[in-house]
Amino acid sequence: MSKSVQLIKDHDVKWIDLRFTDTKGTQHHVTMPARDALEDDFFEVGKMFDGSSIAGWKGIEASDMILLPDDDTAVLDPFTEDATLILVCDIIEPSTMQGYDRDPRAIAHRAEEYLKTTGIGDTVFAGPEPEFFIFDEVKFKSDISGSMFKIYSEQGSWMSDQDIEGGNKGHRPGVKGGYFPVPPFDHDHEIRTAMCNALEEMGQTVEVHHHEVATAGQNEIGVKFNTLVKKADEVQTLKYVVHNVADAYGRTATFMPKPLYGDNGSGMHVHMSIAKDGKNTFAGEGYAGLSETALYFIGGIIKHGKALNGFTNPATNSYKRLVPGFEAPVMLAYSARNRSASIRIPYVNSPRGRRIEARFPDPAANPYLAFAALLMAGLDGIQNKIHPGDAADKNLYDLPPEEAKEIPQVCGSLKEALEELDKGRAFLTKGGVFSDDFIDAYIALKSEEEIKVRTFVHPLEYELYYSC
């Protein structure tokens, strides 16, 4: 009996919710009666849908596509009144019954399979740490009459002199003052706990939760690592849980990289390692306990860092986070335990846990694409023995200009990142993991956003130039 059928029978499930992720990382769903999943061929034939309605996918002349549910992903939805079973789906091309070339989950699957063909390893593990803000209310608009946004947060540092219903209690983190405070300074302990309870209920293993550095409600929930595709699935589930619990509490959550000017943004540090025959290939006798394989993996990420930014930092807003002075790693260098480097080697108690941590990605990234791209960059480093050079065991934020200019940096804008992705794509197309067709479509899709933001009249321009 399949996992789905067992859950349907055990919990009297009424509905199944088929979910998939588009190119930008947005989740979509369609809901159908649970009885359909009891049919013998459901997991072979799937459900038809209109692919032309998904940005960056099909044209209207060839729009039919298939949602093929993955039985291993079956989990009960804790937020629905009627018992509902969530199933993550792969996108299938009806003409070939193969995975759709532009499906991000299919790309992540191909990256895992490509790893096996290289002989370097058979399993890749990913452990992302997506940060997020929880606000009380947000208002924004952008049209021909003007543009604005306004954040309402009782715990914002700017609220100390404001009238608040029930009284202003005064306990709130200041700018860059929110790391690890206890309640009542940590206003979000209970809501994070509710999020963690929901994640555990959905099969994820929570390791830690805490308030993060920024004021106004920056938070993090740490969940146990997993294999690449499964971890990307779990990131999407975590986002779903965070948004829905916040909504249930009458609040609103965001994973945008830099919602506040003048305070830390939200990153998504990604821990990675490769195993072969059950052994961690990153453990060795070199720098910080790393193997030569791990150092070459780091070398690949550093070499392709700017091209990677197109997937790991895919928003114009990403580059408002990637600036010096806000704990964002802009230098493409590596170091043990040095959080100013873009690649860190965390301290571990056992060689089994040896890994690298890429610190420049952010949670606007599509996790399937970001994890797959990081893996492909690392594999290229291993295959071509790209050594990363000496470790940067110093505070890179304080380097004098003449030293800083010798260290490569991440991109400074989405436009630059897309240009670097375009010209540096060769490492991604190995083994057919990313296709040129997909990369072209992705660049076109993200370029539309970049052009819109770049050409839109900004409120700050009125402040700077209205009286010229």
Swiss-Prot record:
Its cofactor is Mg(2+); Mn(2+). Keywords: ATP-binding, Ligase, Magnesium, Manganese, Metal-binding, Nucleotide-binding, Phosphoprotein. ATP binds at residues 207, 271-273, 339, 344, 352. It comes from the Bacteria. L-glutamate binds at residues 264-265, 321, 327, 339, 359. Mg(2+) 2 binds at residues 131, 212, 220. Oligomer of 12 subunits arranged in the form of two hexagons. This is Glutamine synthetase. It comes from Pseudomonas taetrolens. The lineage of its organism: Bacteria, Pseudomonadati, Pseudomonadota, Gammaproteobacteria, Pseudomonadales.
